[in-house]
Every structure is written in C-alpha cells, then in structure tokens.
Amino acid sequence: MVEDPIPLPNASMEVSYQNPIEAATIPVQIAVAEPVATPNPPPCLHENKFLVSVEVCLKPSSTARLEDVQRAVERMLENRSMSYADGLVLIPADDLFLVDNVQRICICDTEEWVKNNDVLLFWQVKPVVHTFQLIEEGPCEDLCADGQPASFNEWILPAKEFDGLWESLIYESGLKQRLLRYAASALLFTQKGVNPNLVSWNRIILLHGPPGTGKTSLCKALAQKLSIRCNSRYPHCQLIEVNAHSLFSKWFSESGKLVAKLFQKIQEMVEEDGNLVFVLIDEVESLAAARKAALSGSEPSDSIRVVNALLTQMDKLKSAPNVIILTTSNITTAIDVAFVDRADIKAYVGPPTLHVRYEILRSCVEELISKGIISSFQGCDGLSIPSFSSLKEKLSESEVHDTNTVPWFCKQLIEAAKGCEGLSGRSLRKLPFLAHAALADPYSHDPSNFLCTMIETAKREKSEQPE
C-alpha cells in the first residue's frame, strides 16, 4: 500500500514487499507520487469496486475479539487516501488499540486486478478485512499400535508452521488464484443449498506433476489461506494429512480397520458445528499402484479392498458441506482413474519457468540481504529487487556493465535463473545456501561475488541432475 497524491491528514504510510513474516519489522518508505490533474471525480461508493483482501494477524498475546480488531482496521483504512498494492501496511503509532493487538496488516492478491505493475486507487477498492490469530501448537499425530506408522497428522488452522507459506510459493498462470476461487465457489454452492443432483461438485482437488514442485506445500498453504478467509463462517478449521502408505497393514483385514478409524475421526470433525475440515492425501498414486497390483495378483486382495473402502468413504464425505479433499500425485500416468473422475480440478504443477525461477531466487536474495548475509547494492531501494515483469524498465545498456548496480544485479540474477532450467522449486530454494557454502570467504558480504558463485553453483547442480 502506498500513498495517494491527494493530500489528506495522516495519509502517510509505509510498506515493504518482503516476506510478510519478516517485513513487519522492516518498513520501506515509498516515494510520494506527483499530483495529477483529475478532471473527473472519483466514482461514487455505490459503483462496482475491486474486492481486495486485507489480512490482519493478531499478536499471540492479544485477547481482543476478532470482530473488534476488524472494525478498527476498517476505520483506519476509511480514514486514509491511498493506493493499493501487495505489501505490508505500517500500523499507525497513534492507534494504541492496533499497536497493542496487531502483529501485521497485509494487502493480498491485488495482482489479480492490475496489470503492468499498476496500483489500485482507493476509490476503486472495497477492502475485505480478515482477522486471525495463529495457532502455535504443532501437529497432533495419530498413534497406532503394533508399530504401525501414524495414519494421519492433524493441524489446527491457521497454524504458525504454515505462516508465510502461501506467499513463498510462486507459479505461472494464476494457479493459486484459480484454487482460491474454486474453493470459494464450492463452499458457496454448498452454503446456498444448490442441488448436487442437478449441479455436481465433489470438493476434491488433484495436483499432479514431478517431485519438488511444491504440490504438497500448495495444498497446505491453500488450507491455511482458506481458514483465514472463511473464519467468519467457519471459526474452527483443521487439516488432516493422511499417510497413504500407512493404510496398508501386513495383517489380513487390518487395513480396512485403519481406513474406518481414519474416516471415523474425520466424520467426527465434520459433524461439529462451525468446523471446516481439509483432508490431504499425499502421493495418491501409491493407492492406485496397490490396486493395480492386487488386480494382477501380485498383491493380496486385501489391498484392493482398502482402496475401494477409501473411495467409498470419500464419496460419503460428499454430503458434508464443510470438507475439502486435497490430493497430490508425483506420477501423472499412475493416477487412478477413480480419483481422476472424482476430482473437480486436475491441475498440473510443472517445473518452474524462467520468470518463476527468477522470482524464487529474487525472494531468496532479498532474505539474505535483510539478514545481513550479503550487502545491498548501489541504487537498490531498501531491500527491494525489481521484479521480472519490471526488468525492461531497469536494464539499460549504459548501466548493465557497472557492477553493484541494480541493472547489473538483475542481469546476473537472470543468468543464474537461466542456469537453473530443469531444477525443481525445492532445489532452487537450496541454491543460495549452496552458493554461500561454496564461497572462499563465507564472511564476505560482496553481492557481486555471491551472484557469480551462485551462477556457477546453478550450473554444477544442473550437471549433477540424473538423466
């Protein structure tokens, strides 16, 4: 969020475009735009506006009611004339209620409405404020007897463990927004009582693609995001991560009991009023492989009964209005047809493109700069490195050869991103660490030396990838 040229009292605001977890303590001053003549007045309040999400995270020590904080933030936004862009809003020092209770205020997902790095003006926007408080408890593991692995892990959402996960995942083609809109529509259709015999939807999402592309993380981040966006309707949210491999027991007929126990637990959660339940089944192709093996005679018939029981239990959950099933698969060709037919969305999550690779490395380097591991560079505005979409404005031939300048830095970062073609997002996140470990002087803060080393590290990592 940045200032609007219209001068109003207390209209100044600071914003940082860093990871929301860290950026709350590192505000960056944004320059004020020059006044522009506006022959036409802003649109009236009754005209259509863009809905922009404003997420407000309460401090762990806060005992304030979420509704009170929501109203306080809405009043703060109404009293300010600003432009809207993704980033953190500095909490006004004179608002003691917000200072005492709010950890951060974040503007989210404005890129869905704007193009070419534009911003939304205050009269174009209707802020939708979501208040939440993170749960600091870790996952609760289901303990099984006889040395069996746990059949599921349970999180209460929104969990501190998943804080910032949504923002750290970068994809092309609006995948994250597509999933958000799907989930919102699925819950709305259920809430409005749409007849499922006339309009069918199963509330099942299938993400498939090669390993390391963030499918499981995206499912967890989606559950976290929806627990924040839907907390006025569902004040209690839980994530159940099913361990598909644990559903197969070495004892005959025991596997069916494990499935029954698992879904009995899920059914109890679903029946609670005001509860929203997310069921995550990771590596769902393992179930498909077991069923095929059982049909061919190489596995006991108990395996196929487990898979069929699981599918039957999933069908039973269809009648529950407050459950969403998230599934992932690493092997697209091995996905069971029964699962494919049930999924409303079947999204392929492939290796990162050049644009995505650059943005991932950019976020990593900004984090290292903010922690003082490497130094900033000449012409850098605080910790912000230009995004991939704005590079054409930054890369001029006259400056690109001057080291430690923004154009040179971006050019080197692009070279590193090009050298990472074929690497997964998981490998890309490790690259800055491996590059720093390869430095002759690990205490050197020279950004040019670090980037050159990262380019070499990227080439080495790519050459060591299996064919």
Curated annotation (Swiss-Prot):
Gene3D superfamilies: P-loop containing nucleotide triphosphate hydrolases (3.40.50.300)
GO biological process, one term: homologous chromosome pairing at meiosis
Residues bound to ATP: 209-216
Keywords linked to the UniProt accession: ATP-binding, Chromosome, Meiosis, Nucleotide-binding
Pfam families (alphabetical): AAA, AAA_lid_TRIP13_C, TRIP13_N
Gene ablation phenotype (knockout): Reduced fertility. Reduced number of seeds.
Recorded GO MF terms: ATP binding; ATP hydrolysis activity
GO cellular component: chromosome
Localisation per UniProt entry: Chromosome
InterPro entries named in the record: AAA+_ATPase, ATPase_AAA_core, ATPase_AAA_CS, ClpA/B, P-loop_NTPase, Pch2-like
PROSITE patterns per the UniProt record, alphabetical: AAA
Protein role: Plays a key role in chromosome recombination during meiosis. Mediates meiotic chromosome remodeling and crossover maturation.
Family from the record: Belongs to the AAA ATPase family. PCH2 subfamily.
Protein name as it appears in the record: Pachytene checkpoint protein 2 homolog
Gene from which the chain derives: PCH2
